């Protein structure tokens, strides 16, 4: 008797070049939740430089046709209300949806001004049973937050230690506190993280985070021409080539960072230019 491993053979021939439809009336809504300061009882440090992280992607996503809405230091109840409002709105005439969180993180939570919120509570509002007008459309979540307590060590330690001064205008590297876990979200979701799980996410106090800086640069160069997950791979490469030069923690000097993304997309994602009105 011959035994074989069972497998499923679909009769459907899949087109590897198939793309999401990007010919709707509008590109879609992009929400940016920016958190610089936190309620004192959380004992979380101020996130200097995060306003640059708000402004840079605002400009880039606007150029790609998104309607960008920015919110600063919202309380958890306010943030949930904004997310709920958008998830219950109609996206019938939109290509996709995008949401950016700039904050501290912990476990499977992200911090608002006064409390932490479970990320799956936020993404769950955009699943098919809750937001039918986004079924089959890309839902992109970008999370700039620390995800652990380790620095990525360079393989070739040829770094020169630079001494940091205490002037406010100096571009000092800091880290976002606590950790965020990689979370499943569902079909047509794309979860983008500033750093791989278990490692620090670096943020400069003047220029903003490494990840958002380099994501914004790649969007400016290739946002309308390159498939989006390929663009994210370029961002991974660019961030991985950075190192910490100025930091109050001498042990952080020379350390590295590598972002990551978890794609549940089912087609290629191109932000093709919209026709001029």
Curated annotation (Swiss-Prot):
Q: State one molecular function term (GO).
A: cysteine-type endopeptidase activity
Q: Which intervals of the chain are annotated as region 130's region?
A: 108-125
Propeptide found at 1-5, 163-176
Keyword match Transport: no
Q: Where is the lipid attached (S-palmitoyl cysteine)?
A: 247, 260
A cellular component term (GO) from this record? axon
Its biological purpose is as follows: Cysteine protease that plays essential roles in programmed cell death, axonal degeneration, development and innate immunity. Acts as a non-canonical executioner caspase during apoptosis: localizes in the nucleus and cleaves the nuclear structural protein NUMA1 and lamin A/LMNA thereby inducing nuclear shrinkage and fragmentation. Lamin-A/LMNA cleavage is required for chromatin condensation and nuclear disassembly during apoptotic execution.
Task: Give the superkingdom in one word.
Answer: Eukaryota
- Tell me how this protein assembles: Heterotetramer that consists of two anti-parallel arranged heterodimers, each one formed by a 18 kDa (p18) and a 11 kDa (p11) subunits. Interacts with BIRC6/bruce. Interacts with RIPK3.
Record-given protein name: Caspase-6
- Major location, coarse class? cytoplasm
For the modification Phosphoserine, the affected residues are 62, 240
The record comments on the domains as follows: The N-terminal disordered prodomain is required to prevent self-activation. The Tri-arginine exosite is required to recruit substrates for hydrolysis.
Ranges for region Tri-arginine exosite:
25-27
* Entry keywords, A to Z: Apoptosis, Autocatalytic cleavage, Cytoplasm, Hydrolase, Lipoprotein, Nucleus, Palmitate, Phosphoprotein, Protease, Thiol protease, Zymogen
Q: Where in the cell is it found?
A: Cytoplasm; Nucleus
Q: Tell me, which GO biological process terms does this entry list?
A: activation of innate immune response; acute inflammatory response to non-antigenic stimulus; apoptotic process; axonal fasciculation; cellular response to staurosporine; epithelial cell differentiation; hepatocyte apoptotic process; intrinsic apoptotic signaling pathway by p53 class mediator
Q: Which reaction does it catalyse?
A: Strict requirement for Asp at position P1 and has a preferred cleavage sequence of Val-Glu-His-Asp-|-
Tell me the active site.
Answer: 104, 146
Regulation of its activity = During activation, the N-terminal disordered prodomain is removed by cleavage. Concomitantly, double cleavage gives rise to a large 18-kDa and a small 11-kDa subunit. The two large and two small subunits then assemble to form the active CASP6 complex. Can be cleaved and activated by different caspases, depending on the context. Cleaved and activated by caspase-8 (CASP8) and subsequently by caspase-3 (CASP3). Can also undergo autoactivation by mediating autocleavage at Asp-162 and Asp-176, while it is not able to cleave its N-terminal disordered prodomain.
């Amino acid at each position: 008797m011959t035994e074989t491993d069972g497998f499923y053979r679909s009769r459907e021939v899949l087109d590897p070049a198939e793309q999401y439809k990007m010919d709707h009336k509008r590109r879609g809504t992009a929400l940016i939740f920016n958190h610089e300061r936190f309620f004192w009882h959380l004992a979380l440090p101020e996130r200097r430089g995060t306003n640059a992280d708000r402004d840079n992607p605002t400009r880039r996503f606007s150029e790609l046709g998104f309607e960008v809405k920015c919110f600063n230091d919202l309380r958890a109840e306010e943030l949930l209300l904004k997310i709920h409002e958008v998830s219950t709105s109609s996206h019938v005439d939109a290509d996709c949806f995008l949401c950016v969180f700039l904050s501290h993180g912990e476990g499977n939570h992200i911090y608002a001004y006064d409390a932490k919120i479970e990320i799956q509570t936020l993404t769950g509002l955009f699943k098919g049973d809750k937001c039918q007008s986004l079924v089959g459309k890309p839902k992109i979540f970008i999370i700039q937050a620390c995800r652990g307590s380790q620095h990525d060590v360079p393989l070739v330690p040829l770094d020169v230690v630079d001494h940091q001064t205490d002037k406010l205008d100096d571009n000092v590297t800091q880290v976002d506190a606590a950790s965020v876990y990689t979370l499943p979200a569902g079909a047509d979701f794309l979860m983008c993280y500033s750093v791989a799980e278990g490692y620090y996410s670096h943020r400069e106090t003047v220029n903003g985070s490494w990840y958002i800086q380099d994501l914004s640069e790649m969007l400016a160069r290739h946002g309308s021409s390159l498939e989006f997950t390929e663009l994210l791979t370029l961002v991974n490469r660019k961030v991985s080539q950075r190192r910490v030069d100025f930091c109050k923690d001498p042990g952080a000097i020379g350390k590295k960072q590598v972002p990551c993304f978890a794609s549940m997309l089912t087609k290629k994602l191109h932000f093709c230019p919209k026709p001029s009105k």
